[in-house]
């Protein structure tokens, strides 16, 4: 991907959500390793928490990076059922998805919670993938721009320039997640350009042009090539298609 200040390396991440036991996860990654070893983009898999230690172990020495799907913002304490950024850091996890629409929708995560998680991730050497996007109602009411730019501004509140440069943002229109509906490449690119413009207004040209922004929402082998040809799309956050080695490797090897 071409940025004004140099190349932005494409990043394609698979979000497995609440799928795959440890054995199933190992089988999937063992199938993936030879299929994606020549990939020109950065490849990330995000398995469920219990699978992270094993997946971290078997991806060692490969070009596959490992991400978590979520984390809490406190380092430790009486927070039953939560996983801390320190725990992920000690596992040498590379990335962490923050603010996924399912977290916002089902677990009532707010932009303020997302902001705390972003800060905690950076404190523990994790690169966050910040998810933003609008619902079908918001899209139909013509407030996509307002909703998405607000999520970006509140999510990035008080983050430093050097942190935002490392960050990945994923634009995932909520109406296109798991529905089989996909934003057209032009629609996705338009909103992603808006996200970049919002970051530019907060941090300036250099940061905005260095920042990688993915599209997420029913990404498939049949849609990826066109999506990746767009000027502002730097990668994909892949859901269902990341659970099949053939599909995910076809997406990763889109060129």
UniProtKB/Swiss-Prot annotation:
Its EC number is 5.3.1.1. Signal peptide: none annotated. It is found in: Cytoplasm. It holds the Pfam family TIM. Substrate binds at residues 15-17, 178, 218, 239-240. Pathway: Carbohydrate biosynthesis; gluconeogenesis; Carbohydrate degradation; glycolysis; D-glyceraldehyde 3-phosphate from glycerone phosphate: step 1/1. One of its GO terms (molecular function) is triose-phosphate isomerase activity. It is an enzyme of class 5 (isomerase). The keyword Cytoplasm applies. Its main location: cytoplasm. Keywords: Cytoplasm, Gluconeogenesis, Glycolysis, Isomerase. One of its GO terms (biological process) is glyceraldehyde-3-phosphate biosynthetic process. The active site is at 100 (electrophile), 172 (proton acceptor). SUPFAM superfamilies: Triosephosphate isomerase (TIM). Homodimer. Involved in the gluconeogenesis. Catalyzes stereospecifically the conversion of dihydroxyacetone phosphate (DHAP) to D-glyceraldehyde-3-phosphate (G3P). This is Triosephosphate isomerase. It comes from Clostridium tetani (strain Massachusetts / E88). The gene is tpiA.
């Amino acid at each position: 991907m071409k940025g004004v200040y140099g190349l932005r390396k494409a990043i394609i991440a698979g979000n497995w959500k609440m799928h795959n036991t440890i054995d199933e996860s190992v089988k999937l990654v063992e199938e993936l390793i030879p299929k994606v070893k020549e990939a020109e983009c950065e490849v990330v898999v995000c398995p469920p928490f219990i699978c992270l230690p094993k997946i971290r172990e078997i991806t060692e020495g490969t070009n596959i990076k490992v991400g978590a799907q979520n984390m809490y913002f406190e380092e430790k304490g009486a927070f039953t059922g939560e996983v801390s950024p320190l725990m992920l850091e000690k596992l040498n996890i590379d990335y962490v998805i923050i603010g996924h629409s399912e977290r916002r929708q089902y677990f009532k995560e707010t932009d303020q919670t997302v902001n705390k998680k972003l800060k905690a991730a950076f404190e523990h050497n994790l690169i966050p993938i910040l998810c933003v996007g609008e619902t079908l109602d918001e899209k139909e009411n013509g407030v996509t721009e307002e909703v998405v730019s607000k999520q970006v501004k509140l999510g990035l509140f008080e983050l430093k320039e050097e942190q935002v440069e490392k960050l990945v943002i994923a634009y995932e229109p909520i109406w296109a997640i798991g529905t089989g509906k996909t934003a057209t490449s032009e629609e996705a690119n338009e909103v992603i350009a808006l996200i970049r413009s919002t970051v530019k207004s907060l941090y300036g040209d250099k940061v905005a042009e260095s920042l990688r922004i993915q599209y997420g929402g029913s990404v498939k082998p049949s849609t990826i090539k066109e999506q990746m040809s767009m000027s502002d799309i730097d990668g994909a956050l892949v859901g269902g298609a990341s659970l099949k080695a053939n599909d995910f490797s076809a997406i990763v090897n889109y060129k």
